[in-house]
Amino acid sequence: MHNSPIKTVVIVGGGTSGWMTAAALSTVLRGQYSIRLVESDEIGIIGVGEATIPMIQRFNKVVGIDENEFLRETQGTFKLGIEFVNWGKLGDRYMHGFGRIGQDLWTVPFEQYWRKMRALGKAQDLESYCITRMASKANKFMQPPSDVTNSPLNDIAYAYHFDASLYAKFLSKIAIQRGVVRTEGRIVQVTQREGDGYVDAVVLASGERIEGDLFIDCSGMRGLLIEETLKTGYEDWSHWLPCNRALAVPCESAATLTPYTRSTAHRAGWQWRIPLQHRIGNGHVYCSSRISDDEATATLLANLDGKPLADPRMFKFTVGMRNKAWNRNVIAVGLAGGFLEPLESTSIHLVQAAVSQLIDFFPDQGFSSADIDEYNRMSRFHFERIRDFIILHYHQNQRTDSDFWKDCAHMAVPESLVEKMKLFRSRGRIVRFDNELFAEVAWLQVMQGQNLQTQGYNPLVDLQSEEDTVEYLESVRNVIAKCVEVMPEHSAYVASHCAAAKMGM
């Protein structure tokens, strides 16, 4: 009996997490399983402007989503990276651009040659050698061309900005077309099997009982199944990431449609800016023990590009993760599994990663403990590596204008991050742990942008003469500059490929 296949999958909660899960499972399971999604119209979803990372392209391709249609339906724009303002110190500005920087030479990473020449005053800023950073600076965008080879244009890596609630709506249509049954209703009771405590049904206010074999908890931070029912426990990381509230508000669009997200550090947190076709999504993530809600609201509203289109909405959170993402026959996806502030636009990716792992470890009714343990190990690894990357932004700062930033600079950080920073300080080397999300080039840009100083460079760089290295760097810079010149404006590219219908608020 234990090897019998799963018959019914019940997804508790809609929103982006629920409908991403439903769309992916209905595609991969090909109608061989019953999939039900339960959501209540009484419960609002956190539908703000959402920024993503390039991995989302893989998800959309698996589901079979046409890119231009998706962007039209979600008021979406393209994203080449994230600009960070005032993060190292007041007045600092740098970008984490997607994709490659320069071109490696022999077995030595490009940035090692750059580092030597930069110290000698013979190299430009790092951004000059990254096509996505230079294109962002010029507000240019194009997709990698299929008819051009051996060009920096092939290295254009990109993601998207879109309206999260519209994305959920878009995915719901796909999932329902592929057999997912949506049930509207408020869950008032969760029942468990005697003996092992597995969830066997959810009961709605209407009295309807919905049974299932596998339950996916997409109920948000409350964790209706994973926490309120199974008491899984939550690991609090607020001693490393003390921000615990966010205010979100849309505003009128600016004149220029920028192809990047912006993060501006404030006195006790930071503000996001996400450009959509019809508006700009804004939010202020802050620490409530260092700034009042009224002050945080005033800071947010004082730093908008245009007129606010709604009243700010507040969200309270504790950064951290569940002790287990998979407990018995319940898998937590999205905010039900944990929360990391969206500084590096990882919220959607964490949903994608959870769904991908679920597909890799899809169970039968035996619910293998080995599979569950490995799923939980992978989930923890994924969360912890992203956690470290976010902590780096806070910890490696030189700001002295507030106790918040001074405390972040002096706090103890995870040993895994200590080792990464120590290695970089030595000779600028970066080691990527196993399959962690962020590649070496991402760590490089943030470490460099946050002014983490190195004591040297790879000695193999000295095998090439300074003259040849300068010539090589200059050739890379010139080719990238010429490529950016031929790229269209981001706004023009959106208008010609994926312009959405005009819509009001």
Which residues does each predicted region cover?
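Conserved FAD/dinucleotide-binding core of flavoprotein oxidoreductases
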Residues: H266-F317, A336-L350, F361-Q365
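Dinucleotide-binding Rossmann-like beta1-alpha1 core, especially the glycine-rich loop
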Residues: V48-S136
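Long, low-complexity C-terminal extensions of enzymes
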Residues: D360-M505
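N-terminal Rossmann-like FAD-binding beta1-loop-alpha1 element of flavoenzymes
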Residues: K7-Y33
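Conserved mid-domain beta->alpha element of the FAD-binding
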Residues: G320-R385
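Predominantly flavin-linked oxidoreductase catalytic cores and closely associated redox partners
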Residues: T149-A296, V355
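Conserved N-terminal helical subregion
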Residues: M95-Q189
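Glycine-rich FAD pyrophosphate-binding loop
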Residues: S26-V48
